[in-house]
Amino acid sequence: MSVSAVVVTYNRLPMLKEVIAALQASETPVDNIIVVDNKSNADTQEYLTSLGDQIRYVRLEENIGGAGGFNKGIRYFMEETVYDYVWLMDDDTVPTPTALAELVGSAAKVDNKFGFLSSDVRWTDNSRAKMNLPFPIDRFKKIPLDATEMEQLRNATFVSVMFSREVVDKIGLPVKEFFIWGDDIEYTERAARVYPGYMVPTSRVIHKMAQNVESNVSLDSIDRVPRYFYAFRNRMYFSRNRGFVRFLRAHIRIAYEAAMIFFNGQPKKMLRLKMVLKGVTTGWFFKPKVEFAKNKAKG
């Protein structure tokens, strides 16, 4: 069972070095590390170039966001390698030495019939990372911190998640037009329609975010507010394909988030509301196409 890791990076060199070192220290060897660079600065380029054949370096000509980066990384995995599995992570995701071993072992437990396998994502204080909380099929179930058994999930984030070549061949690539936010949820839900997706609680990674907080348009800093356009547009897009109940629930949730803008004491309320409305209205008509990659393993 062979595994390629895909790391998407943008101007976080110190953290990227830690991620690559952790991958190289994995108790179950990573057969191949693909680093997709969203046109980071010269320091990142020089460092990645200096690694030579320790990695496969894919430098992009422009920053196409996390969604575009993972699209390119998975395409490279499919078209330039013949490895069995692809393991995705951000450039601030530090896997523990046994993280991959637990994913690979769990794949064998289900006879490799899984849509995705995700790790238990923790923050630096060992609490669950709030941006990567697991969502079980049973929406009322909470997975305990000391869980050891695989748990079926609705979806997962790209902070340590593994797919098989077989599944990628069937479902295609992440939607690069998402740019950021929601590409991972849409993609893992697509994968879960092929086989069930699972969380592997014994596979641990550390998501080294500056703060352990969820994204929130009403509370976030002003410099980050414009990116919420993508969040709401993308949520509208995939809610249209989730059935009426989930479509309705998405609209109710978004209406609540918009209302909270006026109850939280943060500045630029109209700018925040503008991003919500612009994202929602654009999302009603947003129809990107799913791309497929050639499968080198098929010849």
Question: Can you say where each PLM-predicted feature lies in the sequence?
Answer:
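Glycine-rich, basic loop-to-helix element that forms the pyrophosphate-binding segment
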Residues: 60-80
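A short, conserved alpha-helix in the catalytic core of glycosyltransferases
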Residues: 161, 167-172, 177-203
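Conserved donor NDP-sugar-binding/catalytic core segment of glycosyltransferases
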Residues: 98-131
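A recurrent flexible, glycine/aromatic-enriched loop bordering the glycosyltransferase active site
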Residues: 143-163
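Non-catalytic, C-terminal membrane-associated alpha-helical segments of glycosyltransferases
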Residues: 244-299
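Short, acidic, metal-binding catalytic loop of nucleotide-sugar glycosyltransferases
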Residues: 21-30
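A conserved acidic beta->alpha catalytic loop
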Residues: 22, 35-46, 62, 93-94
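Short beta-strand-to-loop acidic/aromatic patch adjacent to the donor-nucleotide binding site
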Residues: 82-92
